Design a protein with these regions (language model features):
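A short SAM/SAH-binding and catalytic strip from SAM-dependent methyltransferases
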Residues: 95-108, 131
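Conserved class I S-adenosyl-L-methionine
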Residues: 1-32, 45-49, 68, 126-151
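A short acidic, Gly/Pro-enriched loop at the edge of an enzyme's catalytic core
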Residues: 85-96
Length: 259
C-alpha cells in the first residue's frame, strides 16, 4: 500500500482530529512511565502532548511517511521513519500510543495481540482507529472508484481493512494479556465543517491518500470534482452553511498487570 501524505492538508482539521487523541490519552493512567512511544506520530503536533503529560519520560515517535517525519522534526519532535509492523515494546516501554494508524494495516489485530503480550508489567497500550467505513463519505467514494470511469486508474479501489467493534478488541486484548484491565469504547464525533466541499477536503487528507498516490495531478482534480456533488448531496449544509459530519472512532486502552 502506497500512501502519499500531505502534512499541511492533514492538519487542515487540526482541532477536530486532535480531540480523539486527547480523549484517548486521558484514559491512560500511567503515573511515571520510563518510555512513551507514539506510533504513527504524523506531523508530530500531538506528540508534544505526551511529553507534557509525562515530562520525565523518554518520548519516542515514528511514522512510515517521510513527509510526516520531516514535518514532525520541523515541530521539534525527534521522529524516525519506521513501519508499525516492525515495532515491539521494549522492557522499559511503559506507554504505547497508536492514534489513527492501525486501520491502514490489514493484520492490525495480530499487532495488538503482540504488543499487549510484550508490554512490561504495568505497561499501557492505547489505540484509536477510525471506524467510518460504512458512512456515506466512504461508501460514495468506494462506489465511484469502482465505476467504469475510475476502476482502470485505481484498480485497487478504496481499501477497507475491517475495523472491529469495541467488544472484539476487548476480547482480543484480554486474551493476549491475561489479568490486564481492558477498556474499549466507541464514539461518534459530530464535526461542524464549512466550505464548498468540506467532507471532500476531510477525506482528501486521510482516506483518499492511497488513491491520490495512484493518480496524476489532473486525474486527482477530476476525481475531486466527481466526488464533490455526491458528497454535498449526502451531507447538505444547514441554513447557516454548516455541514455536520459524523465520524465514528473505536478506542482501546489496556493496562497490563503490575509486578
Amino acid at each position: 500500500m502506497t500512501l502519499l501524505w500531505d502534512p499541511a492538508l492533514y492538519r487542515r482539521h487540526d482541532d477536530h482530529r486532535a480531540r480523539p487523541f486527547l480523549d484517548l490519552v486521558s484514559r491512560v493512567g500511567a503515573i511515571a512511565p520510563r518510555e512513551v512511544v507514539d506510533l504513527g506520530c504524523g506531523p508530530g503536533h500531538l506528540t508534544g502532548v505526551l511529553a507534557q503529560r509525562w515530562p520525565d519520560a523518554r518520548v519516542r515517535a515514528s511514522d512510515a511517511s517521510p513527509d510526516m517525519v520531516a514535518a514532525a522534526r520541523d515541530n521539534g519532535v525527534d521522529a524516525v521513519q519506521a513501519d508499525v509492523r516492525d515495532f515491539t515494546p521494549g522492557p522499559e516501554t511503559d506507554v504505547v500510543v497508536s492514534n489513527a494508524v492501525l486501520h491502514w494495516v490489514p493484520e492490525h489485530r495480530d499487532l495488538l495481540a503482540r504488543w499487549a503480550a510484550a508490554l512490561p508489567a504495568g505497561g499501557r497500550l492505547a489505540v484509536q482507529v477510525p471506524g467510518n467505513e460504512s458512512s456515506p463519505s466512504h461508501t460514495i467514494a468506494r462506489d465511484l472508484l469502482a465505476s467504469e470511469a475510475w476502476a482502470p486508474q485505481v484498480p485497487d479501489g478504496l481499501a477497507a481493512y475491517g475495523v472491529g467493534t469495541p467488544e472484539e478488541y476487548a476480547r482480543l486484548l484480554a486474551a493476549a494479556r491475561p489479568g490486564a484491565h481492558v477498556d474499549c469504547w466507541e464514539t461518534t464525533y459530530l464535526h461542524p465543517l464549512t466550505g464548498d466541499d468540506p467532507v471532500g477536503d476531510w477525506i482528501a487528507g486521510t482516506t483518499l491518500r492511497p488513491v491520490r498516490a495512484a493518480l496524476t495531478d489532473a486525474e486527482w482534480e477530476r476525481l475531486r470534482a466527481d466526488l464533490a456533488p455526491r458528497l454535498r448531496a449526502a451531507y447538505p449544509p444547514d441554513d447557516a452553511g454548516t455541514t455536520w459530519f459524523g465520524f465514528r472512532r473505536v478506542f482501546a486502552v489496556l493496562a497490563a498487570p503490575g509486578d
